[in-house]
């Protein structure tokens, strides 16, 4: 059995999350949006909202729930990076911050997570 490194695990989780979102009619605008302030896994649009999504994937809860890895520090990074995206794209819209938690085969979409 091959073991995946952290990048491969992250890529797998993000791929699952993108498919999940597309099936629910979200429009994916960006993936892995990076700036000096941080990174946003997925930026999507639905129902007049721009949604900044952090994806956390784990096979088990040995290190806690995936959502617990979205610390206050990580939330601040995502918010600062989202501000950069809004400014760069000259957007004026409602936005929200979601977490997609993937634990094994279970997916939970936590809307307005922070």
Map each language-model feature to its residues:
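Structural motif
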Residues: 37, 48-52, 94, 107
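Catalytic cores of nucleic-acid endonucleases
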Residues: 57-105
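Solvent-exposed, charged helical/coil patches
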Residues: 1-23, 62, 68
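Conserved beta-strand positions that form and line the central face of beta-propeller blades
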Residues: 32, 69, 109
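A short acidic/basic microdomain associated with nuclease active sites
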Residues: 23-36
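Short, low-complexity, polybasic intrinsically disordered segments
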Residues: 102, 106-114
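Conserved catalytic cores of phosphodiester-cleaving nucleases, focusing on short active-site segments
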Residues: 40-61, 78
């Amino acid at each position: 059995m091959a073991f995946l490194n952290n990048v491969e695990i992250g890529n797998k989780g993000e791929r699952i999350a993108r498919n999940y979102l597309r099936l629910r009619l979200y429009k994916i605008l960006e993936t892995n949006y990076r700036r000096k302030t941080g990174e946003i896994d997925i930026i999507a649009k639905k129902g007049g909202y721009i949604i900044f999504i952090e994806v956390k994937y784990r096979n088990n809860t040995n290190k806690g729930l995936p959502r617990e890895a979205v610390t206050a520090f990580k939330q601040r990074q995502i918010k600062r990076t989202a501000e950069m995206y809004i400014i760069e794209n000259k957007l004026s819209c409602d936005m929200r911050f979601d977490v997609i938690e993937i634990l094994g085969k279970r997916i939970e979409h936590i809307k307005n997570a922070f």
